[in-house]
Amino acid sequence: MRIVFLGSGEFGLPTLKRLHEEHEVQAIVTAPPRTAGRNRKPRMTPIGCYANEQHLQLIEPENINDPEIVSRIKSLEADTMVVIAYGQKLSSEVIGDHFGINLHASLLPKWRGAAPINASIVKGDKTTGVSVISLAERMDAGLVYGTSVIDIGETETAGELHDRLAALGPDLIIDVLTGDRAYVEQDEMLVTIAPKLSRKDAQIDLAEDAQILARKIRGYSPWPSCHLEISGIDCKLLRAIPNNKSGNVGEIMEDGCIAVGKGSLQILELQPSGSKPMTWIDFCNGRQVQVGEKCEAVQ
């Protein structure tokens, strides 16, 4: 099967590798290199790097809907278009007559949008999964060809869930491409939206419930990441669970938990500014954190 693959993030890599092994990937379309890091040097997307490593045809348009790009894609005469975390909306001209499918990181119609993995943890879902849908002009609104479901771990972060969901993609995509392509329509009455995130979304208020705060910390880890100032140090919170013990909001209690509006937070893992990730116990021992110290949310 001749395939054009469109993707930019690491989420699509496992599926792309499988498609390259079992089918003919005629071209890979990805976002152009962007400046990143302290040196501000342009960096290719993970998908672009893989294309170069495998000597596959690579297209990196600023605008996928540019007529020249559309014409170039059509000239490939591919059988199928597979889209995973590409980052641009595709016009009907791009989709054309291809049998086109998209791998989305939720059980649609729940969590349409740019941040479904984060939303599933932050909102307290017990299960999630991936969906393979047809390409549609409305965001994530296509016909559902297949799904794969997993449970969300009690201490699982968005980064960890991302990797587990990405690993579900290859088998499901292959099943859809080689199967009978039966589908179901999405129920528009059940649609929920997971909009694109910003750093502001991860700002926390210690007056909130410990259950809510723990989900935010895990759901926004590793990015955009919740922060607290602890012993005068800006700390990125990576993993936490709620505790029923209560105290004065923001204070570190005798058991090491941080008192919040309802209950307390047990920080399991954090990353102080300028340091590597570490456990809460290692942080407290190294910084000589004292019971009764006050923590402040970083705005």
Task: Outline where the language-model segments fall.
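Donor/substrate-binding cores of folate-linked one-carbon enzymes
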Residues: 21, 80-194, 198-200
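Conserved beta-strand termini and adjacent loop/short-helix elements that scaffold enzyme active sites
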Residues: 31, 61, 135, 147, ...
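N-terminal beta1-alpha1 ligand-phosphate binding loop
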Residues: 3-21, 33
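Amphipathic, non-transmembrane alpha-helical secondary structure
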Residues: 13, 17, 71-74, 92, ...
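Active-site-proximal cofactor/substrate-binding loop regions of enzyme domains
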Residues: 2, 26-31, 37-46, 50-129
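Residue-level signal for inorganic ion chemistry
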Residues: 7, 28, 51, 173, ...
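Internal anion-binding site segments
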Residues: 188-299
